[in-house]
């Protein structure tokens, strides 16, 4: 979901208005994806690097999370959308954490599309956490001091998307908006064999017609 800031700059409005427009685009894409029968949709909402932005912008983004849950929860449940969070959202402000907890609880019974929201997420950070979690688990199961090779399957299982967590498949397609042609630390392990699509369209203007 890239291009909110540039969208706002082009219109001479505050960056937070761009993020608000981006949230409206996300609403459209989520429901459209569900209606199209897409089984898994993952969006990059807030990266581990986004903390470097201004306090005002970061705070505004977190307030939008609360706003999104309040306005969209009923429709998500109605459309049988199941929510997963990729990343450590416990570091967010309390009101955002409570809203996300409610979102997860209210949609845990839903069996339709998996809507996966990457929050405080970084691809490298995810891999490091997965390896550390794996090694900690091994110390419990194998005992201290026992060494054996780590496998791809074990790392995959310990990722946020892995079988020990959300258990969602690797993406078939990764779409990057705003004209940038790089992954920017998004699903680095999982997208090894994904098709990549780059579009100049800024995220707030993106629609299902481009898919």
Residues of each region from the PLM?
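Flexible, compositionally biased loop and terminal segments
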Residues: 1-211
